[in-house]
Amino acid sequence: MKLQFLQPNKEIENYLYWVLRSPQYREYCAGRAMGSAVVAMSREDFLSYEVPPFTSFRSNTVDLLEEIEKRERLLRETNATLEAIARTLFKSWFVDFDPVRAKQEGRAPEGMDEATAALFPDGFEESEQRLVPRGWRARSLDSFADYLNGLALQKFPAEGEDEYLPVIKIAQLRAGNTQNADRASTKLKAEYVVRDGDVLFSWSGSLEVELWCGGEGALNQHLFKVTSSEVPKWFYYLATRHHLPEFREIAAHKATTMGHIQRKHLTEAKIAVPSPEVLTRLTEFVAPLIELRIENAVRIRSLGELRDSLLPRLISGQLRLSEVEALVA
């Protein structure tokens, strides 16, 4: 259904936008939903919803909700840029070997100073039956990173109503949050607890590689938590992410209802790894991109939580404006 305003008014349009996103309106819709295959609501029921008066308090609250949404949008755009830059650098340095090829041809590598260019060799050698930059090694993903599979968490129920960890399954990984998640025990081994910034890889069903920023949770089966004591987070995250298309291709050809990969595929997936010294120097360029991306994603989550706490009060009016402004500041 599309709303058309007889007398365009941006303030009123924004107000109705947020009213229609409020939990009170969603509850109203749920109580009047029709159909089974396709749930819908009648035009009469929609038009019968009683919209609270547009007071100065609600006007100010809408302004704050608009500001929150604007901040979220800018942070998401920034994160998309940070991710794109990190992936581009990784592909150029560790897949296409652009700096090495440039030096081999007697050219200065593009986009880097002399000190950075000096980190890359000027030729190739064979490693694991493939050419890699001289002094580097072709290595399997699971040779430098640990892929910890999650638990069947139905065997670890929560201790109580207020003492639990939300269960992170594929659905939560894709959504980036733990809303409506199952609950598990808080007494799991530490390695099965997921925290902001952890790298998660769903290896079955819908294959995804993500930097988790949805708050503390419990690692469910069919998800790997990826860690390493040998290489930095940015490297094993981008290396795993680089191989995701081929992992999806493998899973798509599995003769089962739920395509997946096996650990042998982690062993078969190779990437060129430089010396620890070179990797440490390159970390100075890429790690800040990933760290800022994580920091921004946590901010987005916090803004979303704030928005969700404000929305019910837009209708009820049960919040002083000074409190709202303090929350958004």
Protein language model features and the residues they cover:
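A short glycine-rich beta-alpha junction/loop motif
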Residues: 1, 34-62, 217-224, 254-280
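A short beta-sheet element
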Residues: 1-21, 37, 169-170, 189-245, ...
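Short coil/turn segments at secondary-structure boundaries
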Residues: 31-33, 154-162, 251-253
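Short, solvent-exposed loop/beta-turn-alpha elements that line the ligand-binding surface or hinge
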Residues: 105, 109
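Sequence-specific dsDNA recognition surfaces
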Residues: 122-128, 142-157, 164-196, 219
